[in-house]
A protein has these predicted regions:
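Short amphipathic alpha-helical interaction segments
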Residues: 201-213
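A short, hydrophobic C-terminal helix/tail in secreted or cell-surface proteins
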Residues: 233-237
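A short, conserved structural fragment
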Residues: 216-224
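Minor-groove-contacting beta-hairpin "wing" of winged helix-turn-helix DNA-binding domains
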Residues: 227-230
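C-terminal scaffold of the Radical SAM
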Residues: 1-4, 8-201
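Short secondary-structure junctions
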Residues: 108-109, 213-217
Length: 238
């Protein structure tokens, strides 16, 4: 418990373990039956043992969904300024943590349906799945981002700009490469028919060829059943 609190403190979080548990209990009392928790890995001085305790805590809260992410140091953040002083997990340790998380979450009934997301059966995030399927969405309010009719745009965080209806455009999105990349993040994989329906032509042969090459090394596997053809990323293994 003390180690968990130290990890929390290193992240600059002010809530306690009890606060987190109370928040979940209050959400349930308010009538929410689909609750998700975020699980972080690769935190300074984190160990496999402390990660396992965090996973057990999430499961003990009896939530229906868990998102698990590896710490990434972004520019213009407090961690970025002191990253040379941080004892961060190397790539091998991060991989070990990820594999252990996948293994343990599965044993607790949280099935992986996307690279970083796990859920009890029937509780996969419809909101995020829409992003991974290149679906459209409209953001409302300052700083809100949207993707509509092939264009990405967002409102300024400034209330004045928002009130003046000022939009900033990020460019286009939802193209073939993005669709393929996001589909491969999903357990369900890249569906040939969905690609053809969305873009009006069949999946380029070079994509299938490349997937077959990776299949030899165990990185991908191709599945064909009746009229269904899929490309999947292989299960993570040590």
């Amino acid at each position: 418990r003390q180690r968990q609190m130290c990890i929390r403190d290193r992240l600059g979080r002010i809530h306690s373990i009890d606060d987190a548990k109370t928040s979940v209990e209050r959400a349930k009392s308010a009538g929410f039956n689909n609750i998700s928790l975020d699980l972080m890995m690769g935190i300074p001085n984190q160990t496999i043992e402390s990660l396992e305790k965090s996973i057990s805590f999430c499961a003990d809260c009896k939530v229906t969904h868990i998102s698990s992410y590896i710490l990434k140091i972004e520019e213009n953040t407090p961690f970025y300024k002191v990253q040379n002083k941080l004892k961060l997990a190397d790539d091998d340790m991060q991989a070990e943590m990820y594999l252990r998380a996948v293994e343990m979450l599965d044993s607790l009934g949280y099935k992986q349906y996307e690279i970083s997301n796990f859920a009890k059966q029937g509780y996969e995030s419809r909101h995020n799945t829409n992003y991974w399927r290149c679906g459209e969405y409209i953001g409302i309010g300052p700083s809100a981002h949207s993707f509509f009719e092939g264009k990405r745009f967002f409102y300024s965080r400034s209330m004045d700009d928002f009130n003046n209806n000022k939009l900033s455009f990020e460019g286009t999105g939802g193209d073939e490469e993005e669709f393929i990349m996001l589909s491969l993040r999903l357990k369900s994989g890249l569906n040939y028919s969905e690609f053809e329906e969305k873009f009006g032509y069949t999946l380029p042969p070079y994509i299938i060829k490349k997937a077959k090459e990776y299949e030899k090394y165990g990185y991908t596997f191709l599945e064909t059943a009746q009229d269904l053809s899929l490309i999947h990323i292989s299960e993570p293994t040590r």
